[in-house]
């Protein structure tokens, strides 16, 4: 009995010392998210050449910053993990001190990607649109070189939509923050760039009710 109490105390102390991380969200996969052999290969799409050039330029900054941060040995200590994450983010901020929204998502890429996101959402059931937007209600717009909010969940991009977006290197990922599409540095938990209001506003529940009442 004393041993069990000790284990519970140690477990509680470990969890209390952990830095809160963005919680991953789980979505149901519907027919729109089933992988299709006809899915486009966006890596080869010439529309995104400028975007890929910007991504490669960012990865060079990320890699250079990473060499100035001590390597993390295999550890389960969350404080060491979060400490390196913060140190890496700080180094990247120094290198990108003058970064602005649109430096990676060029205007042409933002338009193309915005169209892809809008077309995908517009064919999804309204309840699914509301569910995605409700996951990360955000009142303050994102800012470049800031941390992805750890108090908010990491709203996942539907798999079917990911198949249509330009493929990213392993250190970057797409995330939603409200209606904004975020380009997130995974190892630094950093907002690299974003497309404002990439997700179209879902119809209000009152409008949906009105349509159902007057078909």
Name the predicted role of every residue range.
Residues 1-5:
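Positively charged n-region of N-terminal signal peptides that target proteins for export
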Residues 6-14:
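Bacterial N-terminal signal peptides
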Residues 15, 25-26, 211:
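Short stretches within intrinsically disordered, low-complexity N-terminal or propeptide regions
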Residues 18-21:
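Bacterial signal peptide processing site
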Residues 25-46, 50:
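Post-signal peptide N-terminal segment of mature Sec-exported envelope proteins
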Residues 45-109:
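Early exported N-terminus immediately downstream of N-terminal targeting peptides
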Residues 83-157:
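Mid-length scaffold segments of soluble, non-membrane domains
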Residues 130-215:
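Amphipathic, charged alpha-helical segments and their helix-to-coil junctions
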């Amino acid at each position: 009995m004393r041993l069990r109490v000790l284990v519970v105390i140690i477990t509680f102390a470990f969890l209390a010392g952990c830095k809160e991380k963005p919680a991953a969200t789980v979505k149901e996969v519907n027919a729109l998210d089933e992988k299709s052999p006809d899915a486009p290969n966006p890596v080869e799409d010439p529309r995104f050449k400028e975007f890929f050039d910007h991504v490669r330029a960012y990865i060079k900054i990320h890699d250079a910053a990473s060499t100035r941060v001590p390597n993390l040995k295999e550890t389960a200590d969350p404080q060491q993990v979060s400490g390196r994450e913060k140190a890496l983010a700080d180094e990247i901020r120094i290198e990108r001190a003058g970064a602005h929204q649109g430096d990676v998502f060029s205007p042409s890429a933002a338009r193309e990607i915005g169209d892809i996101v809008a077309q995908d959402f517009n064919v999804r059931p309204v309840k699914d649109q509301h569910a995605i937007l409700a996951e990360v209600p955000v009142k303050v717009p994102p800012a470049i070189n800031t941390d992805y909010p750890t108090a908010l969940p990491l709203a996942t991009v539907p798999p079917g939509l990911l198949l249509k977006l330009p493929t990213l290197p392993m250190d970057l990922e797409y995330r939603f923050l409200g209606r904004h599409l975020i380009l997130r540095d995974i190892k630094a938990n950093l907002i690299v760039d974003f497309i404002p209001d990439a997700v179209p506003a879902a119809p209000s529940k009152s409008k949906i009710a009105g349509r159902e009442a007057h078909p």
